[in-house]
Structures are given as C-alpha cells and as structure tokens.
Amino acid sequence: LANNYLFVYMDYIANTTCDLADSYSKLANEARERYWGRPLSRIIHHRHPPPVDVYPNAIPDTRTNICFLGQVREDSGLDLILPLLPELHRDIGAKLKIIGPSLSVERLRIEETVESLGLKNFVELYDFLPLSELEEVMKDCFCGINLITNEKSYSSFATPGKFIQYLQMKMPILATKNNGIVDVIEENNLGVIIEPSASLILSSVRKLYKDQKNYTTSILKYAKEHPYLSIKEYLKMVEDGE
C-alpha cells in the first residue's frame, strides 16, 4: 500500500515544492509525468546513470556472503533464495545477511521461515545499522540482491537505494528486471539481471562469486566515470535555473 499508493503522493509533494529535483531514474520520471499528465519539477537534474562514491574501506579481496539490504516486502524474492542457502553454503561457504527494519510483518514472516526450514546457520539478521557498522557487516559480502517479483510494483521504475549501497561496497548486483537501471547494470557489467527463478538465482550467485574480482574492476571503472556532484554544483544549478 505505502509503496504503490502513498509513495505516489509523497513523491508529488516533494517534486512540486522543491527548487531542484534530482532524478536517479528516467523511467520513474516518465511514469510520474504520465500519471499526472505534466512535468512536476521546476528544475530537474537527471542522474542517469546514477553516480557512485566507492567507500574507501570496502574490501576488494575474495568474499563469501550475500547481502539483502532494506525493507522486506512480500515481493522481495527472499522466499526464492532461502531454500538454496544450504547448497550455496556447501559449495562456496555463503550465508545470507538480511539488513533492515526488523519489526515489519514480512520481516517477521521471513524470520519464521528461516526457523521452520532450519536455516539459522545460513542466515544472519540485522536491524538498520549506522553507516560505520553497516560497512563492517557488508564488507564480507560478494553480491547484493534485489529479487523483486512484482512487475507492477512502483519500484520497477525506480533506482533502489540499496543498489547504490551495494556498488559503494564494490558489490555487484543480482536483480530481476523490475528496477529502473537494468540497462546500466548490463551495459557496465555491474551485476546480473535474471528472471525470478530458483535455478537462475543459483547459477547467477555462483557466477558472481567466481567472477567477483572482475565485477569489482567494472564497479571501480563505473564509479570513476560517474562521480557525485558537490552541494555547490547543485546550488549553482538552482541559481542558473538549469
């Protein structure tokens, strides 16, 4: 409900009351203009492809774990990867780290699923963490996942914040096509885009693990080509009315 309805109106208020809209997703902007029948922003800066500022402490050496960062939803796809964890742990030593709000209905359901399937040895659960702790928890993960299964989700138009966080930690992305930067991921070798099926998840995780150093190289190259703008640069854009 919040994602597909309430967010639309929050998005409207944000875009119509700000001097500058900083858009990470051209698909989201196109969907916004279709929905309201007109452009909403006075000035819009398109950050597509989105910039990445790699964390200096991100560890580039071989890693073994998988990360899911953010709000667990019904369509997050965690139910697809959970049954695969014993095999992945046996093959490459992988565990799944779930980091995000711990009291939502879906998060609690996932925790119950972990318990009922006997997966406690293969899953680590965390609440939202301060940035310093987040880096420490994520640094041994070789990929970040976003396996959205609902093509009608508003998230299908967006660039999930978790994607930027993954790339900042030099982690390639394993995602379904239900996001706003499929082209960026594929064209820049930043991860793997798949259909939401268990067999594809299994083979793709193995590929990302095997080729993680090549993906790290691609991420560093991308970050160099797409740096963040400074606050001064944004303020100048507002002043100039660009």
Where are these regions (language model features)?
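Acidic anion/phosphate-binding donor-loop and adjacent secondary structure
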Residues: 34, 39-63, 77, 242
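Nucleotide-activated donor-binding/catalytic signature segment of Leloir-type glycosyltransferases, i.e.
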Residues: 100, 108-136, 143
